[in-house]
Amino acid sequence: MLIFIISIIITIASIIFLFETVFNKNSNTINNNNNSNNNNNNNNNNNNNNNNNKNNIKENNIDKNKEIKIKEKLILNNNDPKENDLKYKEEFNNFLNKFSKNQEYGYKDNLIDNELRNHYNNNNNNNNNNNNNNKDDQFPKLKDIVYLDHAASTLASMNQIEEISKELKNSMFCNPHSVNPIGLKTKEEVDSIRENILNYFNAPYRQYSVIFTSGCTDSLKKVGEYFAWTKNSKFYYSLESHNSLLGIREYACESIGGSSTTSFQPIPSLYFKCNNNQFNDILEIIGNNDDNNNESYSLFGYPGQCNYSGTKYPLELINRIQKKYPKCKVLLDAASLVSTSSFDLTKYPVDFMTISFYKMFGYPTGIGALIVKNDSGEKCLINKKYFSGGTVNVSMAQERFHVDRPSLSERLEDGTINFMNIISLKHGFNIINNQLGGIDNVKLHTFSLTQYCKEEMLKLYHSDNSKQQQLCIIYSDNHFKDSSKQGSIINFNIFRSNGELFGYNQVEKLASLSSIYLRTGCFCNPGACHGYLNLSKKDIEQHLKDGHVCWDSKDILNGKPTGSVRISFGYMNNFNDVYKFINFLKSNFINDHKFEKEVIKSNKKINNNLCDISDNISCSGSCGGSCGSSGSGIEDYQVQYSNNIKEEKEEEEKEEIENLKNEKDNDEVLLSEIYIYPVKSCSGHKVVNDKWELVPSGLKYDREWTIIDQSGNYINQKKLPILALIQTEIDLINDKLILTAPEMKVLSIPLSYYPISAFDQIQVCGDKVDGLLYGDKDFSNTSGSSAGSGGGGGGNIDNISEWLYQFIGKRCYLVRKSPESHRKSKVDSSNEISFANESPYLLINEESVSDLKKRIIKDNPDSVPSDWNWISKHSFRANFIITGGKAYQEDLWSQFQLISKQQNDTTQSSSSPLVFNSVGDCNRCKMICINQKMGIEEREPLSTLASYRRSGGKIIFGQHLNFADSIKRNNSHTNDTALSSNESSISSSNPIFLHVPSKLKVLSERY
């Protein structure tokens, strides 16, 4: 028995052993086959555990007292390129610690926590299920840019666009006025959207109507146009209102027929401060003008939020006015307010409210709403004259008879509404309500970013002198402590280290180079703009005389700014955007003189203009001195260095300057090439003969033609880079202007022919220039072959406009400067210019171009030198190209003469040397970033120029010139003498020619 039991035990043990052996063998086989996967999974699990532990620690530290549950669907990803940057992480943690805990800032833990979550879980594989909600996926175009112009227009998410697209693909809609099933369904959808809008703003049941418009401006216009104005009415408005609200003033004046003192009353922003005393001041103003006549209504209009400064005005004022003066109806411009804040129509039952939906969720544009309290609409919006399809119950063609529809929305919506875009609105509201957890989350998120950004901006100072100069001045009525008083807008200007202001146009230019997109100007809010900038009526009138208008580049006039810079935040912004913006300010404006041209001065006279300057040093356009014909080199140079140049570079440059002190420079500076640009913004024509004629406006035929759009504004390469591909040629022998372009027939235009159509509204840099337009009746020739390959090219060309249209793809026209036009130079009013921007002549130095290219190659180590071959002298569109000498020495000259090589080599000459004055540095814009070979816009060379070639905040390269005189060479005298004005005047009877090549001799320098 014992033996039997032992036998059984041995058998069982053998079976177990055999089973384990087989199992282990199979397991090892599986493990071998999936070794890499298991390793990856183990690593992922470890990483996930580590990350989860980190996140738990972070969330426990930052998120102890949650008041609002984290919205899992909203993940705002920082995607910071500097994940290992300790400074970045430190700043990010400081930001989170402050704005997730400190309740005085009004922040409750929501969107920022999601941002934190995504930041630390960026590489966590367990977070893949949320990838469709992060910033990169929802806003892929923001990957490499920082968008800070949400007050103008926010952005639509990919989810929103996809849902709209899906509905358009799967559903069918038609005119809601049709009574077929599809039309009825469409009308139901539109009415449903009306209800959604009223619910979103918590409107009392059946007390409000939604009238769809093309936008907030159209809504305001309708109120002004339809309002029940009488001779006893008055229009009150906040001084800090948008132009669209101010425009109602014209309806009031026209309808009331009174003067400015009786028709309207502007209210200073000070009166809107949220306290009883200021409210009483406003109520007193209304009371002083209140009419007891029950038939008269007045209108009080103000913005819920100032689009200039972000100041929020007290909404309680609505109730106060309505309670005390029921005949004074209140109009709220809520476009800026509701973009990042809520509004409650039950709490603040305003009579009329206007909004634009693209400011709320980016798409669709062209849709707004006028939200009307029904009782106020029936009593006050009664002056509508026009009726149209959809607005009447019945009308007659034979006589003046029609009956309006009873409901406000039907009566005030003329024609077929934009039903497709209206239906798209629901997807925008879904983004706010569902994915973002409500507009209050958006407000808290954007306000936190705004607060932090403002605080960081105010920490920035220039620190290179004994008296610290703050970098930014912020225009606001409050301290950004309360989200009920301040929105997500920061308006500011930037100080230079010397206390002067940077022009806002220069700030925008540098921001664009850093892929930061913001807004500059006055933002269509003249009251706020002029008030904050302390601009008087006299200042504004003088600005207008000086040619300054809205949207131009004149940012500083008479030492005062004409506008400012505005940044604004949307829900898709995050800490990384603020971080990049603050670093942009630090790297581009702090101690701004380090970006300026470094000044090299000479104590001794120099010969033949040879101001010997190192290739690595740029000189200032504010240098000076005297030059003569004696001496053979450079002596006793004094170099003024920026205090912030790094020590290594400073020592290297000092050593190079010391070498230059003892060097005898025999380089000869020559005018080597002349270019004219017959058609403004098209390619240039190189002078191939040895001379070219000068005329009062500059080089003959230079910028004598321009291309304009249908509005009469000239078109340049910044608007249409393809213009760079239009080649121009002046054929003097055959009297032709010749235009060629890829795959187009050659177009030739007689030089001696002037068009018969006068056109005097051409806008060039703020000036109105008289021009002659080539119309259908004007003559031109086209050759039978195209300029590019293919032969056929542009097809039949009946006129010049058709040729331009076939190549450009846009309807535009060619205009020639009228012979009677005598437009004055921007930099020297004693000189004429044609369609040029500022001066008759522009000069650049080949050596300066070469130095710039070296810097570009050095600053872009990932590229190869050939990548930058497209950057050349042609990028700068100069008339005069000089060679020889040193880079940037042209900045030193105040006056020089050009001596023909023929004159230099012979004792007799039929013409005299020509004298030119330097009248200013050329302020560069993104025009130089147009690849002249490809007709596309690039980032360089403006980006590199901005790092070392600034003067007074402007980015400069090249010199503006004017023609001063010709020189009579008299063998009996050793000195050069200038001709009298009669002798030197440019006229057909006394033509003056500039020769190529010519030797350049400096007559004087600039200090």
From Swiss-Prot:
Biased composition (Low complexity): 33-55, 121-133
SUPFAM superfamilies: MOSC N-terminal domain-like, PLP-dependent transferases
Class of this enzyme: transferase
Domain of life of the organism encoding this protein: Eukaryota
Biological process (GO), any one: molybdopterin cofactor metabolic process
Stretches that traverse the bilayer: none
Residue positions of the active site: 524
GO molecular function annotation: lyase activity; molybdenum cofactor sulfurtransferase activity; molybdenum ion binding; pyridoxal phosphate binding
Record field: catalytic activity: Mo-molybdopterin + L-cysteine + AH2 = thio-Mo-molybdopterin + L-alanine + A + H2O
Region called Disordered, residue ranges: 33-60, 117-138
Pfam family, one: Aminotran_5
Described purpose of this protein according to its UniProt entry: Sulfurates the molybdenum cofactor. Sulfation of molybdenum is essential for xanthine dehydrogenase (XDH) and aldehyde oxidase (ADO) enzymes in which molybdenum cofactor is liganded by 1 oxygen and 1 sulfur atom in active form.
Protein name listed in UniProt: Molybdenum cofactor sulfurase
Organism: Dictyostelium discoideum (Social amoeba)
